[in-house]
Amino acid sequence: MRQATLYLFFILMLLSACRHDDYIIYSIDEDTGGKTVKSEIVGMYLLNEGNMGSNKCTLDYLDLSGNTETVHYYRNIYAERNPSTVKELGDVGNDLKIHDNKLWMVINCSNKVEVATADSCRRLAKIDIPNCRYIAFDDNYAYVSSYVGPVQISTNTQLGRVYKIDTRTYQKVDSIEVGYQPEELCIVGNKLYVANSGGYRIPQYDHTISIIDLSAFKEEKKIDVADNLHRCRADHYNQLWVSSRGTYNGTPAKLFWLEPDKQGEMTVKDNLPVAVSDMCIVGDSLYFFGVEWSYVKMENEISYGIINVRTHQLITRQLSEAKEIESITLPYGLIVNPVHRDFYIMDAKNYVSSGELLHFHADGTFDWRVWTGDIPAHAVFRMKKQPIYNQ
């Protein structure tokens, strides 16, 4: 009996001594078979949203350095690089950017922004922001859109906010009230433009863009655009491209463009009757895909295309003639290589299991596909030389 007691004591002490060790979840390396091409782009991070409530947001990495003969894809690298982080990245990854050689990840339902080194993906900071959505940067400041209130469908929701963060100290330094359920935001000149959706307030959607003067950090005004705004991107002509998701069962989705008038005030010029779920602007080309529910067919209608941002013309209704693009179940993210114009499409599949990343050459020919985490949605290229701002 005494020997059994001593043996049990020894086992308990051993377990106690080990429990503080970090349990490392190793990333999975997959050879895509694609040929590497050396350029100033050395890699691409991909943020998998993970289904809401599952805490399965993960970060993948595509090695484009050219140090190997073929391109390698690494799944779930954040957990491996940061084994002591509780719950890893969290619940619903909603945006991903690189600024000042740091990787910024907006984790929506975990109410936080995670910051890591862009080269090694080591965690630097966690910034608490309620129901955060998207992020934009101007010099030493980050601007994060936030629904503020809880995740719930109700016409009685509070106005959203934009939080201002010092990128050197990771501290919130200010915030400002905008419209209902603000989504993407972008900067042109000294103005911050915020697309307000009102997505929780069905059927009383918001239909405005908030214009914020960055010097004073004050909202100058709101301009009417359309119901349920989402994407907001700027091109090199200082035009804004803003998507409206419509009302789903009435007003159709459209893409609006805005440009400065003679007084420099941003005004709505016109729209194109296309659904845009995501887009990527490279030069004069706006690549997009749209996923729109059809109440006639009772299924999603998927479309692709390219718009010339200078002429405002839809120049093609496809990105590729390859049969592989037809195999995509649910396109959820798109990114175009700004150097070679090859592009990547993220397929969310059924939302609850692994998605896929598909790579196409600039001419649309299919190259390779790999499995990702759940709901691949946001990607950013890592450059060989990232700009460093004043410290």
What positions do the PLM features span?
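Positively charged n-region of N-terminal signal peptides that target proteins for export
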Residues: M1-L6
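Intrinsically disordered, low-complexity segments enriched in polar/charged small residues
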Residues: Y7-L8, L314
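Predominantly soluble domains enriched in secretory-pathway, periplasmic, or organellar proteins
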Residues: R19-Q391
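C-terminal motif of bacterial Sec signal peptides marking the signal peptidase cleavage site
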Residues: L14-A17
